[in-house]
Amino acid sequence: MAGKTLYSKLWDIHEVARRDDGSSLIYIDRHILHEVTSPQAFEGLRLAGRPLWRVNANIATPDHNVPTTKAERQGSLLSIADTVSRLQVQTLDENCDDFGIFEFKMNDVRQGIVHVIGPEQGATLPGMTVVCGDSHTSTHGAFGALAHGIGTSEVEHVLATQCLVTQKMKNMQVRVEGTLPWGVTAKDIVLALIGKIGTAGGNGYAVEFSGSTIRALSMEGRMTICNMAIEAGARVGMVAVDEKTIQYVHGRPFAPKGSDWDAAVAFWRGLVSDPDAHFDRVVELSAEEIKPQVTWGTSPEMVSAVDQSVPDPERETDPVKKESLIRALKYMGLQPNDPITSIKLDRVFIGSCTNSRIEDLRAAAEVVKGRKVASTVKQAMVVPGSGLVKAQAEVEGLDKIFIEAGFEWREPGCSMCLAMNPDKLGSGEHCASTSNRNFEGRQGIGGRTHLVSPAMAAAAAVAGHFVDVREMMR
């Protein structure tokens, strides 16, 4: 009998029943909620008179709409200027209070982005099924968990039944071997992958990231890669459990204690793909060949190494792709064959659920220390992923490094990742962003987003345009 992949093992453990149409009923261990996709779900429960099936399986925090300036974070929710944002945060508070859900409220030091606080609190554990009304829930797969985003109607289903009806996916292995060159990060790995297979390359697959390069990454690096599995078209991204996983989880507030911990660890160590497991697709990358990446277009697959140029649509033989390239270049205000290093920046954003953890901030601070943000850059901001990340950075003095360089040091939240709060781009502005999506209007109407690693964003802030961070730090 053939061995099983990690995904298949987790699926089998959580499959409650198989239905005649081929779908399955899957049990959900952890449900994380935020203010945007939960209001209608709670209202549905009230209208149907349904209680929560398992209250303590849920945790919540506001993140998408919360302002990130101190002025709007002091005092009550009335300090939130935007009425819609204020209503959504207030509604989450009321729903969590009414249904008894543990919430890290806006001014709780533990508040932060859902995909930062889940692992940080130990609410995300190996072997779990984890869902959230947010597509980047794949982040939690870095812990050997089966994690994916769900829609608002599914949020209600999980609250009411702790189960979901879903289809099993195919298995894809992304194997990355070798040692990453200095200055090349997990963000560059996943952008290079998306550039190779495209944003549809992972459609219908659960992706397991493996190989010596992945094993060498920290847990925070693994979270970055799993976070953007969705940009490669996959609903699920995951990494097998190893000692790094176990050490990261140990001692965190929601993690098991005592004999429960010992039993959990014994189980977790088996959460790896068997040596003879079959994958439906295998993609291989060589770490040594990966360079710092920069997106130049309006899709994550429109990406090049920093020492390359914007492509020329005239060289594209596929008419559909050619038209897509022409539209992207027009929107981005770029010309064919422009060097990536010629792209000038108006704003720089270091944050988001992709790259706002302490290691990300350390990497950026290392670049800007003793330097200044270029006078041509209108705004450079650092938005920690949680209050605890912010506090740790301040203990290490990272906030002072950023402020002295000319960065704004903000409160935690999703911030400029998406135009759903006060942090937005103006039309036509170019932004070096450590977030995960560069669609038209993602960071503001007419805004032009370039996805990069924290170190590359920091270097761009100093230079005023894209540069190879390896050259700057040489």
UniProtKB/Swiss-Prot annotation:
Which class of enzymes does this protein belong to?
A: lyase
Pathway per its UniProt entry is: Amino-acid biosynthesis; L-leucine biosynthesis; L-leucine from 3-methyl-2-oxobutanoate: step 2/4
Keyword hit for Repeat? no
Q: Where does [4Fe-4S] cluster bind?
A: 353, 414, 417
**Membership in a protein family:** Belongs to the aconitase/IPM isomerase family. LeuC type 1 subfamily.
Q: What is this protein called?
A: 3-isopropylmalate dehydratase large subunit
Entry keyword Iron-sulfur: yes
Task: Specify the taxonomic lineage.
Answer: Bacteria, Pseudomonadati, Pseudomonadota, Gammaproteobacteria, Lysobacterales
UniProt gene name: leuC
Q: Extract one GO BP annotation from the record.
A: L-leucine biosynthetic process
